[in-house]
Amino acid sequence: MALQFTLNQDAPASAAVDCIVVGVFADKTLSPAAQALDSASQGRLTALVARGDVASKTGSTTLLHDLPGVTAPRVLVVGLGEAGKFGVAPYLKAVGDATRALKTGAVSTALLTLTELSVKARDAAWNIRQAVTVSDHAAYRYTATLGKKKVDETGLTTLAIAGNDARALAVGVATAEGVEFARELGNLPPNYCTPAYLAETAAAFAGKFPGAEAEILDEAQMEALGMGSLLSVARGSANRPRLIVLKWNGGGDARPYVLVGKGITFDTGGVNLKTQGGIEEMKYDMCGGANVIGTFVATVKAELPINLVVVVPAVENAIDGNAYRPSDVITSMSGKTIEVGNTDAEGRLILCDALTYAERFNPEALVDVATLTGACMVALGHQTAGLMSKHDDLANELLAAGEHVFDRAWRLPLWDEYQGLLDSTFADVYNIGGRWGGAITAGCFLSRFTENQRWAHLDIAGVASDEGKRGMATGRPVGLLTQWLLDRAA
């Protein structure tokens, strides 16, 4: 965890912390805690706001020192924007802005009072949970492979949250731990996070908790199961594949929810080799796997009363003399044959066998998560994941969960009219669908291996990582998936 969290019900003016975080709206209205500090300081805060020394527009932060009558030596005032437009997005932005302002520097402990604000259609428990997940995300530092590079170790370490809902805090912390677990895996270089490492890390976590268990299938076991599609992708790599299976037994005899995550630890594209301007970010192609593992972490930490199974096919798509080729015909675990049109459409080839394997758990619902297509990113950008399902109830559950925690998805069609684009003369199905509608035809491909399941597909290509040299794994959609499971457990 980037931060430690506690609950605090002290009067803001007497809180024994390095800094108190309060808010001010564009019309100069103070948040409840800011009003309390203003009263304790005999109007000092109001005077500073009126004089223009405190900015109130969204995204602004102003650090004040030594307000009279206030125990904390610092007060951070966060701009909340227009009161009439204050809702979920401005609240989350304000929490993140406050945390980033204190991420480095002299402040080690702070009291966040923004949880006292009224957020439209949300309750106090939501305010606390989201404050924890957003602030921990904002305070995250990657250090795993920095070597001798000096890390700034100053700044915020402990954040007290105004409120008294211990369960909300615990669920927020569990979710934040899941997000950070996923981000750490996603950010690791591919020479560190190999299929074996991913499997060992997931199994090590499961081994620490009663009710959690892990099974790791090796190449021989997958071959015995007939996973010819997955193993074809793995042929060109010296890093041999694993199938990671994690189980959380919190729901008695109830049918499990099953999450399947694409775990391509590095994607060269294979024989259809990727080029510079994209290939250097292909360590993030395992973020689907990392994020369902992160959701497992959140579920276990929150001790949700459900049964959950997570399946991650962990494979490296590399190239050597034994690598699979365009025009190969391979046989999947389902028995369906697949003509390879492009070796860079490998994610669906490992997922189809993992989805077939997942049927043995008799899922209540089956959801796969994958950085599957650039086409989804072209269509939807970096703001939302793509969602496909033939089951309206399941799709609506996932969409609602994403809206609730602002980790959103947008539904794309999965109509039968697209299926013809996957026709093959030489096999049961072609692994690509042509130039147009690539995200949808990828979903259509997977639908052929989930025909008897209540299934949905999340294409997270646009949301799993930030772009560019300084980009990092985001941990999305751990928030969406955890909220969906919380809703199922309610």
UniProtKB/Swiss-Prot annotation:
The enzyme's E.C. designation? 3.4.11.1, 3.4.11.10
Keyword terms of this UniProt record: Aminopeptidase, Cytoplasm, Hydrolase, Manganese, Metal-binding, Protease
Q: Which residues bind Mn(2+) 1?
A: D267, D344, E346
Active-site annotation: K274, R348
InterPro entries, from UniProt? Leucine_aapep/pepB, Macro_dom-like, Peptidase_M17_C, Peptidase_M17_leu_NH2_pept, Peptidase_M17_N
Q: Which GO terms describe its molecular function?
A: manganese ion binding; metalloaminopeptidase activity
Which cofactors does this gene product need? Mn(2+)
Q: Which Pfam families match?
A: Peptidase_M17, Peptidase_M17_N
Record function comment: Presumably involved in the processing and regular turnover of intracellular proteins. Catalyzes the removal of unsubstituted N-terminal amino acids from various peptides.
Task: Please state which protein family the record places this protein in.
Answer: Belongs to the peptidase M17 family.
Database matches in HAMAP family = Cytosol_peptidase_M17 (MF_00181)
Q: What is this protein called?
A: Probable cytosol aminopeptidase
The primary gene name is pepA
